[in-house]
């Protein structure tokens, strides 16, 4: 007799419904179901690190993949260490619309919110 053990693993980074729905809409506009949103961290910006977003058609072998609403968020291993516990989100307000990261690991952010320090 064999038994299965199911273990719930916490997601290393969260992909909000609003971000996933925006990506879903952009995929529909481009008519390219292979598109995935990639979030990454680079050195730079006024606080030391900057977030970046781009679209990719393929995932790298070592990417972390998070799915929501039928779309995929990709994070490379180097960036993931800075984003653990964070949330990729999307806002559309008076200041414009944009993807952003709510990062609990950031000790400081710049005024525009696109760079951070740890």
Curated annotation (Swiss-Prot):
What function does the entry list? Required for insertion of 4Fe-4S clusters for at least IspG.
What is the superkingdom listed in this entry's lineage? Answer: Bacteria
The similarity comment for this entry is: Belongs to the HesB/IscA family.
Q: Which key words tag this protein in UniProt?
A: Iron, Iron-sulfur, Metal-binding
**Pfam families xref list:** Fe-S_biosyn
User: Got a GO cellular component term for this one?
Assistant: cytosol
Assembly, in brief, is:
Homodimer.
How the cofactor is bound: the record states: Binds 1 iron-sulfur cluster per subunit.
What is the organism of origin for this protein? Psychromonas ingrahamii (strain DSM 17664 / CCUG 51855 / 37)
Q: What is this protein called?
A: Iron-sulfur cluster insertion protein ErpA
Q: Which Gene3D superfamilies match?
A: HesB-like domain (2.60.300.12)
